[in-house]
Amino acid sequence: MFNKDKVKIGIAPIAWTNDDMPELGAENTFEQCISEMALSGFKGTEVGNKYPRDTKVLKRALELRDMQIASAWFSAFLTTKPYEETEKAFIKHRDFLYEMRSKVIVISEQGHSIQGKMETPIFEEKPIFTEEEWKDLAKGLNKLGKLAKEKNMKVVYHHHMGTGVQTTEEIDKLMEMTDPTLVYLLYDTGHLVFSGEDPIVVLRKYINRIKHVHLKDIREDVVKIVKQKKMSFLQAVKLGAFTVPGDGDIDFKPVFNILAENNYEGWLLVEAEQDPARANPLEYAIKARKYIQEKAAI
């Protein structure tokens, strides 16, 4: 059983409005997003492209709905640009999240990333880091981890399709090369299964470094089409590769059990990017919240 005082349930705005494809959900407002999240029973959210960056305005809107900011995505370019560029942007990002009382900072290395390229096949063109790039990535993440620690925050690394840290082997390498007291892991079920990995293996191995969880389900039949037709990540999203927990092919019960048995503390955050014109965000948010209640008793 989860400790209900230590575990919070949130949902990402990506089901309402998509940062990589702004045309998806362009009609959905910030207020609609967070109102429907709260109506569905969620207590937190990550930051999307419609969210105000004025912390006073954002806090007020969230407080009215008894909501919090769990975290926000940060794109690092430690493998392709001078470290100082990433650090400058990171400090601004960190300070914004600190103002919003967030405890974790989601980081993904976007050097060589193809996740935002509409015509680039996700499996065939996946980037592979050189040894030098791995060293730059690890060294840079350790530095960013120290900057987060200054504010009593944690860097959580987001393994992601179409990036240099996608597979279990790549996650292993990153975890091995970084300081476990400075760099933690964001565990994303959907990205692991999409990549062909066993999510339970990664969960068991890094349970003590996992400080943020994205609950994302997969439609295996759609992934097969993506592979057959050599589609891109964005094309896969539009086709419906991802969905909310309980609507796809992942069994989340063992995931919840392992997290609970190991006294996981932090956010369980539903993140399922779909085309809102095809998958009504409110309907799917309610479906996800009911499923989590049934399977995790929280």
UniProtKB/Swiss-Prot annotation:
Domain of life: Bacteria
GO molecular function: manganese ion binding; myo-inosose-2 dehydratase activity
HAMAP family: IolE
Cofactor(s) demanded: glutathione; Co(2+); Mn(2+)
Catalytic function, reaction form: scyllo-inosose = 3D-3,5/4-trihydroxycyclohexane-1,2-dione + H2O
Source organism phylogeny: Bacteria, Bacillati, Bacillota, Clostridia, Eubacteriales
Protein known as: Inosose dehydratase
Encoding gene, per UniProt annotation: iolE
Keywords: Cobalt, Lyase, Manganese
Membership in a protein family: Belongs to the IolE/MocC family.
